[in-house]
């Protein structure tokens, strides 16, 4: 937003400009909702939360050198009286003002916007899109967790002038949330990576989950493109005839032909592509096909080496000093991603045992027991030892036929692993965030 002056920022947000910045001051560099991260030149947006009213910190942000603040009228007087030369903008609802500002900046950028959602795989697809597109276009992708009604507008506002493609991850916790994110971002391409049993506790059925994800398709303009998994029955009621659709996966417009080591062969609407990748997991090949389809939708022909940079908690492999390989996939879990993680464990070379440390999968509703038993059965033939963490994960022992240990929490699991792991072992750690299995990885790496 550096090219915008304070008057334009206020007008775009639908806010009142109560105090201007220093004469000749350009627009803000970034927007932030945490005053501690609102540095000099940034716009601090004071949001009212369940426990904290961010507007109370507006004066401190100005004193610290913020370009300006956007607050409720109740905090405007204190902000105007604060030291510093920053702008003060007031709006009845700073959050909706943030949304309006983001949409205005998105339109001014002129970038192609790709929205990515899915029950699993949206983060890796977003990252793969960045790797696919960056050699051909100036591409910006969502930062970690900038995928909510707060994170998406902040990510849009962080995109600098000259951005050609903006790839936005879109998360949801219930119906209506993807529709909101799409209204803010106005995507040119909407990608649904997968549909699966996630947030069942809130939505109740797979059909309801598909409907919530398909809000992205419903929001697309007629000139936009939907990128969808081929043959996904749950999405059939939500297909549109007035929007171009590209499918990926078996029998899709973009499909895998073969993988030989790091070389992947893809058929993209009859065109043969050969890419070099740094992964061999089946679920990542699926995500790669989604990324390739989205790239083709905006006229980019993927080529060369596509390198996925894995983040901690998202399948990152590390060799521990004791000679144990850790697969850190502790960020989150659902039945689809749990199977994918076990597949990754299966293809990881091991001189010793393959150990699966699996925690509760939360928010699965009344069918939680069944889903956990299915994971226990799936682990047969993959894991030599299964360590279940938490009361729900205990159900995995019912169907797992190998050696099994049940522990109550992450700390106990970490202590157990410290005793039993041997050089050459491979250990997978995965569970829902609420179980806190990140602690296990931290202990193993210490």
Predicted features, each with a name:
Residues 65, 82-84, 135, 185-186, ...:
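Short, structured coil segments at secondary-structure junctions
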Residues 1-117, 124-135, 150, 157, ...:
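Short, basic phosphate-binding NTP loop
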Residues 10-13, 75-80, 191-325, 351-352, ...:
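Acidic, Mg2+-coordinating active-site environments of NTP-dependent enzymes
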Residues 95-230, 234-242, 419, 443-446:
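Phosphate-binding loop of NTP-binding sites
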Residues 116, 122, 312-317, 438-442:
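ATP-dependent carboxylate/acyl-activation modules
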Residues 49-52, 56-59, 311-313, 322, ...:
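Active-site beta-alpha connecting loops in nucleotide-dependent enzymes
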Residues 117, 417-445:
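A glycine-rich beta-strand to alpha-helix segment
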Residues 9, 42, 61, 101, ...:
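Residue-level signal for inorganic ion chemistry
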